């Protein structure tokens, strides 16, 4: 049986609060960037180099994604994949994939891992 990704998962974009407003930073909400993924290179990720505050969260269009969401970098570097170990947010360099009941997050992680070269090839035009 074949499915389109949007039939079995919800795809979420991230966002970045203004970096010039100090009230938005050093809070309790985990916020992940592609750089964080490149530094950790692990199957699971729980936090990055910076956290945002509730004000920072409210100021932009980032979304708090649930535990077990697949995080896929969609901007340089493209193709880093991890699974959220807890609720967290990402910047705009991600497509976060919240799996539905038709697919297990770990399966999605491994399946996407086999598609990295393809994702890179289509991202370069």
Q: What residue ranges belong to the model's regions?
A:
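Short acidic/glycine-enriched loop/turn segments that link adjacent beta-strands
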Residues: 26-28, 90-91
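Short, basic/aromatic beta-hairpin or loop at an interaction surface
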Residues: 38-51
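Short alpha-helical functional segments enriched in proximate histidine and acidic residues
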Residues: 15, 118-119
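Acidic/polar loop patches that form or flank catalytic/metal-binding clefts of enzymes
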Residues: 18
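Non-catalytic DNA-recognition/assembly elements of restriction-modification systems
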Residues: 1-15, 31
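A short beta-sheet element
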Residues: 33-34, 49-115
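Short, intrinsically disordered, charge-balanced linker/junction segments flanking boundaries
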Residues: 120-125
């Amino acid at each position: 049986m074949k499915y389109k990704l949007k039939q079995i998962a919800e795809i979420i974009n991230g966002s970045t609060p203004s970096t010039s407003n100090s009230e938005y930073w050093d809070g309790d909400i985990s916020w992940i960037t592609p750089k964080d993924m490149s530094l950790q290179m692990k199957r699971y990720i729980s936090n990055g180099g910076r956290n945002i505050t509730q004000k920072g969260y409210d100021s932009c269009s980032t979304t708090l994604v649930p535990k077990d969401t697949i995080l896929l970098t969609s901007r340089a570097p493209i193709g880093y994949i991890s699974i959220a170990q807890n609720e967290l947010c990402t910047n705009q360099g991600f497509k976060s994939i919240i799996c539905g009941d038709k697919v297990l997050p770990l399966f999605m992680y491994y399946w996407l891992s086999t598609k990295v070269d393809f994702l890179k090839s289509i991202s370069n035009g």
